[in-house]
Amino acid sequence: MKTLRSRFLALFVIGGLVFGGLSVEAAFAKKPYPTAQEVENARKNAARKKAMIKRLQTIITDLTAEQVALERVAMIKAEKYNQAKDEEDAVAAKVELLQGKVNAATAEAKQAKQQLAEIASQMWRNGAAGTSMSLFLNAQKAGNLLYQLGAQEKIAQSSDQIYKSAIQRQQYAKSLEDQLKEAKEELAAKTAIAEDALAAARNAADELQAKVDEQKRLNRTFVAQLARLENISNSLEQQRIQGLIDEQRQNTGTGPIDAPSLYEVGPPDTNKVNIAFNFAKQQLGERYVLGGMGPNVWDCSGITKASYAAAGVYIGTHSATNQFYNMAEKRRLIPIKDAVPGDLMWYSYVDDFNGDKYHVVMYLGNGMMLEAPNPLRVVRIVPLRYGDLFRYAGRPTD
């Protein structure tokens, strides 16, 4: 998807997936920052002052680009964790289900064995047992239950069904135990993957926070220097700088991406959309926490899932990618240019239906979206960003 300006695309490719072994930090050459004396000297000459202003503004936009790239990495790694946790939860549910089946099957097999023991005891008392019955009652000689059962040539015809059922139940219980063992091994592997993904996501969040702390510190200096060069107040200069930063962020894409319709999708259910909106807006200002889905902490797919759940609509698991697949399976994808309030939108680093979607938002209309983006931000309403925006939106209701 060629929606990023060349400079930002280069930054994101290097910063997002660490191609060629380079980190985001290594992607940006460390440029020397102007000293207070250099700024003071520049004030004495109009040309030098103009050049110094441009230099400082360039430094600020470069720092912003670094932060944007790190935010993207943090969102990608957060989605990797959510996917891994989804898989872990699915296997954990499988283990729990199998454990219940094993417990029930073991109890049934035990009960069947007791029934056979009662029959054998009765036969012994009635003198109907021979050597094979002795084997049945003597585990040390027989070796195992199935061998014991196979040796019972004198079990009465009326007991034959109980005998066969006991064997089947024993075999069924053993089969379930084998499945449970495999599932537990799979769960251990999935848990390890999820833990690694969580650690990677936390490291990305820490790196992002460190960059923001550095940028705040440097920006205080740059704002003061620019204010002195332009002979305005620091507060006014800060407003100018914030406008520059906002423009830099918003200019990472050109606008809605053209895409063909895949199939007919009906209009949304406005009542359900409004319920989802009302729920989501009640969370504005609440913190982002990786894996959060309420009651007062959220991540991107957590708030979309909970908001539509409040309206009785299932949009997928706690994963941006899974929510995209859910919309695709239900044939509810529409070209991004045809999106209406209530539709879900995704961000992806590949222009591929099967690629991961690292961020999901709720479209509010009029070019605005509601999101829980990353550890530095809270749940918020902001202008739609077009950089990395996937070309299809999803309509949870119709």
PLM segments and residue spans:
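A generic structural signal for residues embedded in beta-strands
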Residues: W346-Y347
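Alpha-helical coiled-coil
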Residues: M1-R7, V73-Y172
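Long, contiguous alpha-helical "rod/stalk" segments
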Residues: A47-S121, L180, E186-L187, T191-A194, ...
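Extracytoplasmic/secreted envelope proteins and their assembly/folding machinery
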Residues: Q99, K113, A117, L146-L149, ...
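Long amphipathic alpha-helical coiled-coil segments
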Residues: Q157-E182, L226-N234, D246-G255
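Catalytic cysteine-centered active-site loop
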Residues: E286-P341
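Hydrophobic packing segments in regular secondary structure
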Residues: K2-A65, I193-Q282
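Aromatic- and glycine-rich peptidoglycan recognition patches
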Residues: K2-L4, L11, L22-A29, E40, ...
